[in-house]
Every structure is written in C-alpha cells, then in structure tokens.
C-alpha cells in the first residue's frame, strides 16, 4: 500500500506530492532528497533546505524523524552560511547524518574575526535557541559580514600608503630638443619644459588638476595681454595659442551701442508722453492721439485704436455723449491734427541730443504699420500728389529696364563656319555639348557634298517655254513645287 506526503514552498500556491511505498511514513532525509530531485534544485552546495509542519510551523530538524503519511509540510530554501558549504549537498549524495539534530549544525564555530568583537546577549540567545528561525540565521550571516568589513576598514585606515610612481605605466620618452617658444605645459601651466618632464610628475601631493584655461571660442578682440600672475591670483587668467597670459575684457563698443539705443527716444515713447497742447490729446487716454479721428456725434478727438475698442466694448455707444449706433465706418479721420501731431513727434525726437543720428532709424522701426500706410495715403492725396505719382512712375520706369537687363538671357556666341558644313552648325568640340560620333560626322559631310553637286530642281522655266516631248516626261517627270 502506498502513502502520500504533501509539500509546497512558501511562494507556491498549489501543493505537490511525494508518493512512497508503506503505511507508516517517510524520513525527513528521504523527503528532502525527493524534493531536491523533483524540483531539480542542483547539487545543494549553495543553500540549506528546511522543512516545517504546515499546521504547527514546527521544524523537522532531525533527518531520522519519520513524517507520517498524508502530512503537509512547508519547504524553505535558505542561503548557505558559507559559500559552497550548503547542508543540502548530503541529501543529493545520499549520505545521511547520523548525529540527528540539525540544531547542532546551526551552532557552528564563530570565525576568528567574530571572536575579537563582543557578542551581545541577543545574538547568544539566538545561537543557543534550539528552535532558531530562518530570519535569525540570515541576521547572523549579515552580522558576521559587517564585522569583517568593519575590521578591514580599521586596518586600511591605520595602514601607511606606499607611493610608487609610474607603477602601472611606462614613462613617456622626453623629446631631446627644447620646447618651442609658445609651448606650455598643460599640467602645471608653466613654460620651459615638456609635459613629459614636468616637475609635478614625481610629486605625490600634486592633485593633477590642470592649471591652464584655454581661450577656445573667444575672439582675439576680447582678449587682453597681462603679466604673469602670482601663484594664487590665476583664477581668471588664460593662455592663448602663442603662450601669452590673457584675460577676457568686456565688449565695450557693443555695450555703449546698447546704452545709446536704450537712451534714445522712439516714436512710441513720444506718443506715451503728456502732449504739450491739450487739443492734440485723446479724449480717452489723455495722450497724443495716434491716427487721430473724430466721432460724428460729438466731434471729439480720439485715437483710432482707443475709440474702436471703446465702441466695440460698449455695443457701439459713444464714450463721450453716449449716443447709440455709432459705427466704425462713420469715424472721420482728422488729417490736420495728424500732421500737427507728427510735427510734435519729430520736434521732440530732433531735440534729443543723444544719438540723434540713430533716432530716425529707431523711429521708423517703432512706427506702426497703420501710421506708415496713413502717411503714404496722405502723400498720395495731398497737394503734392502729382509730384509723388510722377516720382513713383519715374522710379518704376528706371527700375524696369535695369531689372530686364539683369534678367536678360545672354546671346548665343557667333560660331565659326566649318568648311563643308552649313553655317549655323556648331563646332564639334563646343564646351557643354557631347562629342559627335565619327559616323554621324561622315553622314553629314556626305549629305552636304551631295547637295552641292546636285542642287534641288525648281520650276524656273519661263511661261512661254515649249512643252517637252512625252518621252522625256515619261522618263523624268518634273517635280511639283509650290
């Protein structure tokens, strides 16, 4: 009659079974051996195999203990306390341990390094406990490792370092000629010696940080030559390609240009100022009216943008007299006020003494496009409209021939006449054309020769000429020409 023992690992969901012949049970040694064989756990040198009762969680530490049939056990695989000394190896080899209890195997001799450190009472209790758990064994292993590493660190801290220059590398060969005038040792930042013969190569206290900053990417106009700095004042000192000590100086010209542009007034700045005459101010923003226009209801002066925004926000209601249905297309531009405001802006810009030569450029760049279009419309519709139109026509008339002459395709160069070939035929070796095959050249030459010997027949006979006899007509019929 056969019996069954059920087992499963801690992370396993469904239990597995071991079938054996007998009615009593199976020894712990045989159960562990069957588990290793079924699960293919290897030779068992790197782990220990533990069995626990599934109901009471009691460990089966005696290999000779008989586990009754139909018993469920929990299997745990823990790391070996020493590498390659796992206790599961004896179950694979088939050599049982006759001493019995596994608790003796837990009480292994403490390593020599561990004996030097005092053992706490908690650790001694864990070792002396007959039912030591898996966590206690792992904790003991970690404690031994940490003690060994701590002792190693203490030895390393008290040891004296031995400096051996060029221990792992071969000394570089020093050139036999003196360094060039602009050569710099980029190890110490000094001149007069090669980097292979630098005095700091044999210095054990040298940190190895480079003492030289290169001027890569910095224009020469931004560099200024200085004297050789002291040992501790070389923070901002660099060395150029010629070996001279330089420092970076600021771009004074660009900074002055920026400051002058910032100090110069623009048209936008003038429009934001308080107007010198209240009649030129906008009714809403109280500033110079930009693109001045008037409302048809109360005839007040507004900026074009201010009045349009106010009408759109108030459902086309005048902000001054509160009249309804004031549409945008009913606003009347005041060209007279626009010219007066432009004169005020120009006078303020002209009175600015700083960078007066750059004021016109900044004014034109900052002038809105609507104002530029309005100026063009005023010039075209003003008293000088005929002069403006004539100048525009003149500029267009002078620009078109120049454009056409620039875009004209150059004429084909005259080709020399080749004997035996028609005049418009290009030469054979003309640049840009492929070379003509010899057979084609012979065919063209033969055709020209045939045409010269036998010119085409034409109807040059006079009107009163006699008709040729029928025999001649039959032999050589005349060709019809149009």
Curated annotation (Swiss-Prot):
It is found in: Nucleus. InterPro entries: DWNN_domain, RBBP6, Zn_knuckle_CX2CX3GHX4C, Znf_CCHC, Znf_CCHC_sf, Znf_RING, Znf_RING/FYVE/PHD. CDD domains: vRING-HC-C4C4_RBBP6. One of its GO terms (biological process) is ubiquitin-dependent protein catabolic process. GO terms for molecular function: nucleic acid binding; ubiquitin protein ligase activity; zinc ion binding. Residues 5-79 form the DWNN domain. Keywords: Metal-binding, Nucleus, Zinc, Zinc-finger. Its main location: nucleus. PANTHER family: CELL DIVISION CYCLE AND APOPTOSIS REGULATOR PROTEIN 1-RELATED, RETINOBLASTOMA-BINDING PROTEIN 6. This is Uncharacterized RING finger protein P8B7.15c. It comes from Schizosaccharomyces pombe (strain 972 / ATCC 24843). The lineage of its organism: Eukaryota, Fungi, Dikarya, Ascomycota, Taphrinomycotina.
């Amino acid at each position: 009659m056969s019996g069954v023992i059920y087992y499963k690992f801690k992370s396993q969901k469904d239990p597995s079974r071991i079938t054996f012949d007998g009615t009593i049970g199976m020894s712990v040694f045989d159960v562990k051996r069957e588990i290793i064989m079924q699960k293919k756990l290897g030779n068992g040198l790197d782990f220990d195999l533990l069995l626990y009762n599934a109901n009471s969680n009691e460990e089966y530490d005696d290999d000779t203990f008989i586990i009754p049939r139909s018993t469920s056990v929990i299997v745990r695989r823990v790391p070996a306390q020493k590498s390659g000394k796992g206790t599961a190896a004896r179950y694979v080899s088939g050599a049982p341990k006759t001493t019995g209890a596994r608790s003796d195997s837990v009480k292994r001799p403490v390593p020599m390094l561990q004996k030097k450190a005092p053992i706490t009472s908690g650790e001694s209790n864990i070792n002396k406990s007959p039912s030591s758990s898996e966590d206690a064994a792992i904790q003991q292993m970690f404690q031994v490792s940490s003690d060994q590493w701590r002792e190693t660190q203490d030895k390393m801290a008290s040891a004296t370092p031995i400096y051996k220059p060029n221990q792992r590398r071969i000394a570089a060969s020093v050139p036999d000629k003196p360094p060039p005038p602009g050569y710099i040792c980029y190890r110490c930042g000094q001149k007069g010696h090669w980097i292979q013969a630098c005095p700091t190569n044999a210095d054990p206290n040298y940190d190895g940080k480079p003492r030289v900053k290169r001027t890569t990417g910095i224009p020469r106009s931004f560099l200024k030559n200085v004297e050789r700095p002291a040992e501790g004042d070389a923070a901002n000192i660099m060395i150029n390609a010629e070996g001279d000590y330089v420092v970076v100086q600021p771009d004074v010209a660009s900074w002055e240009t920026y400051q002058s542009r910032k100090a110069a007034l623009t048209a936008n700045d003038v429009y934001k100022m308080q107007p010198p005459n209240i009649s030129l101010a906008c009714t809403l923003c109280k500033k110079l009216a930009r693109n001045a226009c008037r409302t048809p209801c109360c005839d007040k002066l507004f900026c074009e943008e201010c009045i349009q925004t106010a009408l759109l926000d108030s459902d086309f209601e005048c902000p001054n007299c509160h009249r309804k249905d004031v549409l945008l297309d009913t606003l009347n531009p005041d060209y007279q006020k626009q010219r007066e405001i432009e004169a005020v802006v120009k006078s303020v810009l002209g009175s600015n003494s700083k960078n007066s030569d750059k004021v016109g450029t900044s004014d034109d760049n900052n002038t809105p496009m609507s104002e530029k279009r309005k100026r063009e419309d005023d010039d075209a519709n003003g008293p000088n409209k005929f002069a403006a139109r004539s100048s525009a026509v003149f500029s267009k008339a002078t620009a078109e021939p120049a454009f056409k002459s620039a875009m004209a395709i150059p004429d084909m160069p005259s080709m020399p006449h080749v004997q035996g070939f028609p005049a418009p035929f290009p030469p054979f070796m003309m640049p840009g054309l492929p070379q003509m095959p010899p057979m084609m050249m012979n065919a063209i030459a033969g055709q020209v020769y045939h045409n010269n010997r036998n010119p085409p027949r034409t109807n040059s006979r006079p009107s009163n000429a006699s008709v040729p006899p029928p025999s001649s007509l039959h032999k050589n019929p005349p060709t019809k020409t149009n």
